[in-house]
């Protein structure tokens, strides 16, 4: 009698473990972001970001890309912020603004991408994203932030990248362009390039 009860309990526990493992496995295969939400609530942002990355690779939808960039920022994963923030802010700019109807949020993603590239030492990409994701040199956007970053760090290399990008590309900056040009000229005079 005891052996039958113990055997039944063991079979039941093994069955529950197998069923739970199958449920998690199927959910991971079908919708990684569902499991990512669990890791987010637990505070494990790195794992959640990787799961959101899997979700984005499956769907390539802008909404999944937004969630991936947000989670990468929460995880402070500069490589993922740079890679996917670039896609979001440069390639999907119109879609992003339309989807969120919040240009300030878009600017936050752009600034995070600029900072990530800067931390990774990819200053040319840092400058490119700032220029391409901004239509103006106005306080609060990534282009303005780039110049502030350059000033605060007194980064000659970054200033030179800004100068080269501005001279090489006929950018679409209209609003605040004269103020921006003064800053570029000041960098040229200060650092002598």
PLM segments and residue spans:
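Structural motif corresponding to the intra-repeat A-B loop/turn of tetratricopeptide repeats
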Residues: 42, 75, 120, 152-153
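Terminal, low-structured helical/coil segments at or just beyond the last alpha-helical repeat
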Residues: 157-193
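Flexible helix-coil transition and linker loops at the boundaries of alpha-helical arrays
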Residues: 54-58, 90-106, 172
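Residue-level signature for tetratricopeptide repeat
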Residues: 38, 71, 116, 148-149
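Hydrophobic membrane-insertion alpha-helices, especially the h-region
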Residues: 10-26
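Alpha-helical repeat scaffolds
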Residues: 49-53, 78-95, 122-134, 155-170
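Alpha-helical segment of the N-proximal tetratricopeptide repeat
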Residues: 30-58, 67
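Structural register within alpha-helical repeat arrays
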Residues: 35, 48, 68, 113, ...
């Amino acid at each position: 009698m005891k052996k039958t009860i113990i055997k039944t309990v063991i079979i039941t526990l093994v069955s529950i473990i197998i069923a739970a493992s199958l449920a998690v496995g199927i959910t991971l295969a079908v919708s990684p972001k569902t499991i990512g939400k669990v890791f987010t609530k637990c505070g494990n942002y790195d794992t959640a970001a990787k799961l959101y990355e899997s979700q984005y690779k499956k769907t390539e939808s802008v909404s999944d890309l937004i969630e991936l960039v947000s989670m990468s920022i929460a995880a402070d994963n500069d490589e993922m912020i740079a890679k996917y923030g670039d896609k979001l802010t440069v390639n999907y700019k119109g879609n992003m603004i339309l989807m969120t109807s919040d240009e300030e949020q878009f600017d936050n993603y752009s600034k995070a991408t600029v900072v990530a590239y800067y931390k990774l030492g990819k200053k040319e990409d840092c400058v490119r994203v700032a220029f391409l994701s901004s239509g103006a040199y106005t306080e609060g956007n990534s282009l303005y932030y780039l110049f502030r970053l350059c000033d605060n760090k007194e980064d000659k290399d970054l200033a030179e990248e800004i100068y080269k990008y501005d001279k090489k590309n006929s950018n679409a900056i209209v609003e605040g362009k004269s103020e921006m040009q003064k800053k570029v000229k000041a960098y040229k005079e200060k650092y002598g390039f």
